[in-house]
Amino acid sequence: MSMQDPIADMLTRIRNGQAANKVAINMPSSKLKVAIANVLAAEGYIESVKVLEGAKPELEITLKYFQGKPVVESIQRVSRPGLRIYKRKDELPKVMGGLGVAVISTSKGVMTDRAARQAGLGGEIICYVA
């Protein structure tokens, strides 16, 4: 049986990995997953991102902790296969009053809500991270 929502699976693996104090987590790789992971790494929510080549490429994410606690307090899927959520540039949400990040898929690639607002782009809201 195929996976219905691979992005939700990725976010759940990050959440579970940090709850179990794992150093790194592995998952099947895709271009969108790598783009989301790169945004999270650039924002400082995860340590590093690596794509392991092979018959089936795997994405390895090294998780980040601060004083023994996970850096990611909450990670929540917004737009899902059954209900896509799109917002215009002036409707983009601020997560936790600007302390968190909304990951958005735009026509210019995957970026944060701040970067999308700056570029004047709207798009599909993939997830909220705080």
Swiss-Prot record:
One GO cellular component term: cytosolic small ribosomal subunit
Cleavable signal peptide: none
Q: Which GO terms describe its biological process?
A: translation
GO MF annotation terms: rRNA binding; structural constituent of ribosome
Q: What does this protein do?
A: One of the primary rRNA binding proteins, it binds directly to 16S rRNA central domain where it helps coordinate assembly of the platform of the 30S subunit.
| Complex and partners | Part of the 30S ribosomal subunit. Contacts proteins S5 and S12.
HAMAP family on file = Ribosomal_uS8_B
Q: Which NCBIfam families match?
A: PRK00136.1
State the name under which the record lists this protein. Answer: Small ribosomal subunit protein uS8
